């Protein structure tokens, strides 16, 4: 079978990549894993002409190729307004790939994923939708539409997966919508990263947060908590990893609180550097307001790091076994207290680290691939001719 993946994920040319393209984040890992389920896989994605980017990774996989689209211009309303002209230019490619596909995968949110999803429905193609946002919270009309669509069409040859996890199914109205976790860690990486931690020296507390530098992730609260943490741990530091529109304002916030020398902004780094920074840290702080299934939290757990986070989405399930602490109210004072509670008791810290490793071991990329493969085979039959 041929899989066609329609995604908004921006890719770019790479002379060192077997497919000729690279991208960043967890996308290349997950596409490589999905390609192992099919005879051929085509990624239908926007491509930039810029070849020099930080944190890029080659797109590779079993008989994996890329069909480039032009990159939609603008953001927000401007992007929506320009999308009609983008469609006119890219419709021949979109329709050609839909017609030749045996199964269509649409990761959403995202406008290109949505277009692929609707075209697959129009051409009566088996559809595999993976919702990567917060399934429980719909703030926009698009989010309400995606949820309605998945509940309406989850049955038969259509596989609908919501990224996250809970004891109950995503919806009581349609049991065919199922949970799926998200990861970019291979089993060998989980083994390589696995190291039970001991509490750091009494005055040290190396905190880290890895995420997009945007509002809603709680980065400003972590920065504001650091002066309070330093009262108990005078040598405390904070590593902030990731890029985004709020990066400059967060840097200014560190200056305002007179802790710029204690905060290191790494920007966007590659996967290996993220894991290295996590291995060098003592505690992962992630007071986010909304999530699907945060891969960075899983990576922290895989490195044996206890996690301080919020009661949002799947996070209570990941942390509730004792691999960290959940804060009810996100304030600098609450975060500083949670940091103290994690680091002040050597036995508790050691236990949290052990629990973190146990939790992470359940979420390998191989298990993610096999879970999806089982669901697709149950809906559509054999996926590979050599199966």
Show the residue positions of the predicted features.
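A short, well-ordered alpha-helix in the C-terminal region of glycosyltransferases
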Residues: 341, 348-362, 371-374
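Short hydrophobic beta-strand element within catalytic cores of glycosyltransferases
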Residues: 306-309
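Conserved acidic donor-binding segment of nucleotide-sugar-dependent glycosyltransferases
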Residues: 321, 325-332, 341-347
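Nucleotide-activated donor-binding/catalytic signature segment of Leloir-type glycosyltransferases, i.e.
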Residues: 251-269
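Aromatic "clamp/platform" in nucleotide-sugar-dependent glycosyltransferases that forms part
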Residues: 289
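A short, active-site helix/loop in glycosyltransferases that binds the activated sugar's phosphate group
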Residues: 54, 138, 150-195
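A conserved mid-protein helix/loop that constitutes part of the nucleotide-sugar donor-binding site
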Residues: 192, 205-228, 245-251, 333
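Short alpha-helical donor nucleotide-sugar binding micro-motif in glycosyltransferases
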Residues: 98, 268-269, 276-281, 372
């Amino acid at each position: 079978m041929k899989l066609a993946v329609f995604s908004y994920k921006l890719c770019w040319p790479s002379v060192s990549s077997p497919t000729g393209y690279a991208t960043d984040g967890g996308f290349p890992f997950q596409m490589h894993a999905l390609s192992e389920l099919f005879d051929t896989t085509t990624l239908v994605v926007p491509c930039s002409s810029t070849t020099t980017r930080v944190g890029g990774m080659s797109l590779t996989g079993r008989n994996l190729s890329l069909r480039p689209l032009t990159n939609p211009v603008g953001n927000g309303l401007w992007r929506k307004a320009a999308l009609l002209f983008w469609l006119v230019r890219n419709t021949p490619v979109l329709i050609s790939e839909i017609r030749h596909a045996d199964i269509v995968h649409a990761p959403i949110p995202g406008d290109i994923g949505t277009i692929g999803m609707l075209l697959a429905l129009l051409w009566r193609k088996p559809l595999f939708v993976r919702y990567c946002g917060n399934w429980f919270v719909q703030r926009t009309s698009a989010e309400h539409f995606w949820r309605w669509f998945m509940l309406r069409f989850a049955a038969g040859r259509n596989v609908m997966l919501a990224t996250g996890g809970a004891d109950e199914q995503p919806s009581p109205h349609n049991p065919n919508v199922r949970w799926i976790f998200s990861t970019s860690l291979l089993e060998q990486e989980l083994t390589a990263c696995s190291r039970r931690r001991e509490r750091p020296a009494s005055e040290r507390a190396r905190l880290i947060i890895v995420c997009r530098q945007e509002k809603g992730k709680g980065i400003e609260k972590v920065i504001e908590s650091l002066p309070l943490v330093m009262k108990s741990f005078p040598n405390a530091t904070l590593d902030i990893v990731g890029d985004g529109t709020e990066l400059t304002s967060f840097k200014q916030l560190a200056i305002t609180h007179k802790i710029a020398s204690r905060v290191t902004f790494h920007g966007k780094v590659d996967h290996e550097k993220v894991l290295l920074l996590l291995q060098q840290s003592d505690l992962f702080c992630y007071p986010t307001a909304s999530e699907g299934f945060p891969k960075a939290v899983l990576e922290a757990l895989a490195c044996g790091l206890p996690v301080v986070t919020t009661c949002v989405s799947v996070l209570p399930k990941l942390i509730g076994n004792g691999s960290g602490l959940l804060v009810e109210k996100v304030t600098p004072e609450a975060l500083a207290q949670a940091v103290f509670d994690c680091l002040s008791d050597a036995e508790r810290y050691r236990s949290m680290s052990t629990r973190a490793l146990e939790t992470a071991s359940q979420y390998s990329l191989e298990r993610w691939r096999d879970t999806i493969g089982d669901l697709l085979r149950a809906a559509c039959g054999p996926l590979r001719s050599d199966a």
